[in-house]
């Protein structure tokens, strides 16, 4: 082999090695980017969840840096020794010390084998021993963001869901004021849904999201979530609950924005569709009452509109068209006989007068 051929062969070997190193580095980088890895063989959901906050509004996760405070630094020389030290503190019921030791390990040796274990132990100590559910969930999110492939992903997302339920049930208050906002709880539920869209508890979680929207008087957004439940999980029992609650939210909007006849018409159609789809629904009497209320309101509004056209300021032709439209859309109205009589009267008028 000539020197020229040897150099060419060496260049090819170096090129292949460089490509392999770049691919390895890229794979490692993807593991540390939030959302790059679903973990647990469970694909992330798309961001197409109407009624959820936009993920772009959330702050992107960042790795925790080693603390410059000496008392928050690792007490041992290696991650293995530090993790063993944290477990010793936990066994001695020094939970605050154990949590700090786990945190220090993750900060100092983020790429170590012990880091995911320490991060999980950190989150569970916060939840179980210190009952700091908000911070525990935040640390669990950190585990998902940076160590998704290094943990039992689906099992821990379900644990996170239970954590948010506990967070919501045990909201701490001070003189009636809560330290935890509905928005934060809702966003935690939304995160759970996005991380495990195929989990069995997701429809239930979405009901909770919509419920919180209603508590905050965000009925437009609540309706979107209820619609998403019906679209994504049509065969689940939660869809019946979502249908009733959507009807209730729509009625709230109709009463609040009664001038919007298009909305009233859409809600009337939704009520009829829901009653037809679920003839044995428990809230049937309530749905019927809402439909009757809505039809009565729309009937009166249409009657007043037709009457407004039947005046000296309008032509007989316009009045005739208004009454015909009213009768077509509201044939069972209490004002139907009056409308028919007026149509007959206007139709019998001289053609010249009617065509003005």
Model regions and ranges:
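Acidic, polar-rich low-complexity tracts and alpha-helical solenoid repeat scaffolds
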Residues: 3-9, 15, 26-356
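Sec-dependent N-terminal signal peptides
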Residues: 13-21
